[in-house]
Curated annotation (Swiss-Prot):
Subunit text: Can form homotrimer. Interacts with ExsA; this interaction inhibits ExsA activity. Interacts with ExsC; this interaction dissociates the ExsD-ExsA complex.
Consequences of knocking out this gene: Absence of ExsD leads to transcription of the type III secretion system (T3SS) regulon derepression.
Effect of residue 59 to R: Complete loss of trimer formation
Function text: Negative regulator of the type III secretion system regulon. Acts by disrupting transcriptional activator ExsA self-association and DNA-binding activity in absence of inducing signals. Upon host cell contact, this interaction is disrupted by the anti-antiactivator protein ExsC leading to ExsA activation.
Pfam families in the cross-refs: ExsD, ExsD_C, ExsD_M
Protein species of origin: Pseudomonas aeruginosa (strain ATCC 15692 / DSM 22644 / CIP 104116 / JCM 14847 / LMG 12228 / 1C / PRS 101 / PAO1)
Name assigned to this protein: Transcriptional antiactivator ExsD
Amino acid sequence: MEQEDDKQYSREAVFAGRRVSVVGSDARSRGRVPGYASSSLYRESGIISARQLALLQRMLPRLRLEQLFRCEWLQQRLARGLALGREEVRQILLCAAQDDDGWCSELGDRVNLAVPQSMIDWVLLPVYGWWESLLDQAIPGWRLSLVELETQSRQLRVKSEFWSRVAELEPEQAREELARVAKCQARTQEQVAELAGKLETASALAKSAWPNWQRGMATLLASGGLAGFEPIPEVLECLWQPLCRLDDDVGAADAVQAWLHERNLCQAQDHFYWQS
């Protein structure tokens, strides 16, 4: 196992042009928001800051930007709630400069698994989500839809605030638009509640199947060990063996990466290592 350092290196005007866009349900049904609307999903989720987005829009051609928003690497960070840092932005710009439409496949992260939070973000939570999907294959889709519905809900609030502000200037149009927004908000909240209920039921099933999951997380954060998770589901045994050998087996981190990559839980260019 390679021993190395893990080196990490105003709000915009809401009503500019008096145009407020809302992500449509047709886009959400495809599991991805097209074009520049995709930037809204990453921005609203806190994955890309306003400053980072402005830099990327200035430095990248439109095609490259759209490829970035569609790439698995960035969607992986969205699913895990991992914001871009300076090093990630630098990597994007370097890879995008290549004369190759497959440049997104060169994106990856360096992860020190000796850091408990990195172990949680990059291994345990993705693995738990994958394992949950074995209980019900619809779970990943429910989670993605919930994120997008929550983004749409925030955008609807923005639109409602806008029309409330201009009601005195354009009362009739404002009244119509506010009624339309209220109807959309009610429908969105119904969908959010339905998905949340499904996920809560799935979570209860998962807890009964792996009762020591929560205890294991607490133990890991307190002492750095994985023993609190045991006994683990049988399907995870091939992963758990190298995970428990990370601090004394030079090949364990590569075995973890290979297991995750086979199940599309990490990128080919992700590099896991252990440095305590």
